[in-house]
């Protein structure tokens, strides 16, 4: 295909149907998350959770037959994707002879399933219809996958379908078993049965339950019999074991009703099927997870919080490297003469702005020049002769250090001089706060550079692409009029601030209870700003979230008094306004675990907060509940509207 005007606007890979482009834009770095669990993810249910926009759907679709076959065909023509092929091979989906050995059966959890609960009142009837439809969809996807693979092997689908049989039919619905006297069924029998079941259920839903459905469905077992059918040992081809392993992949499980979601989890965790099962769903700390009681993560299932995994405990650059690769792949498809995205983002300030800021700080800090204690520090500040950003950060760090020392109740006497060597370690730890204070005290740009944009993404690929697309538009505009210089820090920040303001305005129009959510977040963000700009920078680099203890979270779950707060928090998580860092401890090992709710980084832009993690304040549920209360003026304004 031809070049794309703005490759960052070519939205999330799950939305495009071009296999070539899907592969070209896919970054293999994300597969390391699965590789770390390679011994478990095919023998235990795998649950992948994240905020919306992470790329869960794209991850699952990579392992479908069509994409795997296309990836294999790339090995000679597209050497730049050999790393992706190697990564997929390391997960055993493709062998060293480039044959598909495992394949994903992609099952999206659409609204069709939840519609079942709208047309039938009986709970058992709901469950039977739900499982009947789910089984038919799984079988249909299985056969469509086989059809594609057989076609690729130049085999006749209809002829081969009769040759593939299911040996053990003991778990089948009674009515299906009774239709056949032979001790096995061909896939053609299952194919016809699956189609007939789906037609009956769709007719029932389309007629709002006013017509009856086939009695054979009513006699169905309340089981996911398709799981048993598709185990490798149960499928025979011309009497021999089948050469493919299947991974059933449920995408967006959160779109099901609570009853349906719980039913799937209970069935999978209790029945221990002999087939690989992967599930993706949105992260929600406030969902009732009692269905997992009696089971243990890593023993009965594998639960991966994707943001946690890519955040990197030992390598903090995992996510930024991941985004750097995505950027490189996207830039290859641009139709403009912009060679490098990162090089078009300047990190250099106007020399005069830096010099003015340094001279202003030197003058401001001279009030401590008469103090013996700070003599060496002030002399160092006044002796700086290089007017650059590094010098400015050193002066700001010294300024913060002096304020900390002044406010410390256990400070040394004023006549005891602080040695320069005593301050060096402290000053190095204050660099993030110094950089933040360059915006607060010196009015310099803070939200700029590729490194900052990766942090603004909040570990969310979709968000990164949105921000990058805005900056790229400016690059295009400048290239048209032959302006070759990169975007200045000020211009980058202006574009990013416009993005944040637009996102903020969308809350009121795009989310139910949007104004209440804005009120709730606004109060917390203003409080965080007030804490972050304290002259002694007690939280490095600032406060960008709040923490709730496990006992307080239990109140939120159990006490109906807080139902409104619970709804607002769940909306904030669902719409990626808050991200979660679970089960953290503060203090001793015996202390209560804390769940930290971090503001999405674009909210930090809106309220002039730093972009670091780690700075948060503990909040009681009662305090948070007060934050959702609007003042009378706001209420009257909404009534007038």
Give the label of every model feature segment.
Residues 255, 269-295:
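Sensor-1/coupling segment of RecA-like P-loop NTPase cores
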Residues 1-37:
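N-terminal pre-Walker A segment at the start of P-loop NTPase domains
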Residues 56:
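Conserved lysine of the Walker
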Residues 109-110, 373-641:
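C-terminal leucine-rich, beta-strand-based interaction scaffolds used for sensing/assembly
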Residues 35-43, 241:
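Phosphate-binding P-loop
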Residues 61-234, 297-400, 405:
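P-loop NTPase nucleotide-binding core
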Residues 237-258:
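Conserved P-loop NTPase "ATPase switch" module shared by AAA+ and STAND
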Residues 53:
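Walker A (P-loop) phosphate-binding loop of P-loop NTPases
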């Amino acid at each position: 295909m031809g070049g794309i005007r703005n490759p960052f606007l070519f939205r999330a890979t799950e939305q495009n149907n071009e296999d070539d482009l899907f592969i070209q834009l896919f970054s293999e770095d994300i597969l390391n998350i699965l590789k770390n669990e390679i011994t478990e993810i095919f023998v235990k249910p795998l649950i992948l959770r994240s905020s919306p926009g992470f790329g869960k759907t794209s991850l699952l679709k990579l392992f479908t037959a069509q994409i795997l076959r296309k990836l294999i065909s790339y090995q000679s023509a597209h050497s730049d994707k050999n790393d992706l092929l190697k990564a997929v091979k390391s997960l055993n989906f493709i062998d060293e002879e480039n044959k598909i050995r495992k394949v994903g059966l992609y099952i999206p959890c659409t609204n069709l399933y939840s519609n079942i609960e709208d047309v039938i009142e009986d709970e058992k009837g709901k469950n039977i219809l739900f499982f009947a439809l789910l089984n038919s969809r799984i079988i249909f996807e299985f056969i469509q996958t086989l059809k594609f693979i057989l076609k690729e092997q130049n085999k006749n689908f209809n002829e081969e379908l009769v040759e593939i049989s299911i040996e053990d039919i003991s778990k089948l619905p009674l009515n299906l078993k009774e239709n056949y006297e032979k001790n096995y069924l061909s896939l053609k029998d299952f194919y016809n049965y699956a189609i007939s079941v789906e037609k009956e259920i769709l007719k029932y839903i389309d007629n709002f339950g006013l017509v009856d459905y086939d009695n054979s469905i009513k006699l169905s077992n309340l089981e996911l019999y398709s799981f048993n059918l598709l185990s490798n040992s149960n499928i025979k081809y011309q009497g021999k074991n089948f050469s493919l392993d299947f991974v059933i992949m449920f995408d967006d499980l959160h779109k099901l009703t609570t009853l349906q979601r719980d039913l799937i989890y209970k069935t999978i965790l209790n029945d221990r099927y002999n087939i690989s099962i992967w599930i993706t769903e949105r992260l929600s700390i406030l969902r009732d997870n009692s269905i997992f009681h009696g089971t243990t993560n890593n023993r009965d299932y594998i639960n991966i919080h994707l943001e946690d995994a890519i955040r990197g405990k030992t390598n903090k650059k995992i996510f930024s490297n991941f985004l750097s690769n995505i950027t490189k792949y996207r830039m290859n498809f641009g139709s403009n003469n912009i060679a490098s995205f990162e090089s078009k983002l300047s990190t250099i300030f106007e020399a005069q702005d830096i010099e003015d800021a340094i001279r202003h700080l030197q003058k401001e800090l001279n009030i401590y020049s008469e103090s013996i204690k700070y003599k060496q520090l002030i002399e160092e500040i006044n002796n700086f002769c290089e007017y650059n950003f590094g010098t400015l950060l050193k002066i700001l760090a010294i300024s913060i250090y002096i304020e900390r020392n002044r406010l410390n109740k256990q400070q040394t006497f004023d006549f005891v001089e602080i040695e320069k060597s005593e301050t060096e370690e402290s000053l190095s730890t204050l660099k993030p706060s110094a950089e933040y204070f360059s915006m607060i005290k010196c009015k310099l740009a803070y939200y700029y550079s590729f490194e900052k944009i990766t942090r603004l993404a909040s570990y969310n690929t979709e968000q990164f692409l949105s921000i990058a697309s805005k900056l790229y538009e400016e690059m295009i505009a400048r290239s048209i009029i032959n302006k070759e210089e990169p975007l200045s820090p000020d211009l980058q920040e202006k574009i990013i601030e416009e993005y944040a303001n637009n996102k903020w305005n969308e809350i009121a129009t795009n989310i139910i209870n949007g104004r209440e959510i804005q009120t709730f977040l606004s109060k917390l963000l203003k409080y965080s700003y007030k804490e972050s700009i304290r002259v002694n920078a007690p939280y490095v680099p600032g406060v960008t979230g709040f923490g709730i203890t496990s006992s307080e979270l239990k109140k939120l779950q159990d006490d109906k008094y807080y139902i409104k707060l619970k709804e607002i928090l769940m909306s904030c998580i669902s719409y990626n306004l808050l991200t979660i860092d679970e089960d953290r401890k503060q203090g001793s090992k015996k202390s209560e675990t804390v769940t930290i709710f971090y503001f999405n980084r674009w909210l930090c832009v809106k309220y002039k907060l730093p972009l670091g993690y780690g700075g948060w304040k503990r909040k009681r549920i009662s305090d948070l509940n007060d934050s959702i209360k609007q003042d009378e003026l706001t209420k009257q304004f909404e009534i007038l509207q």
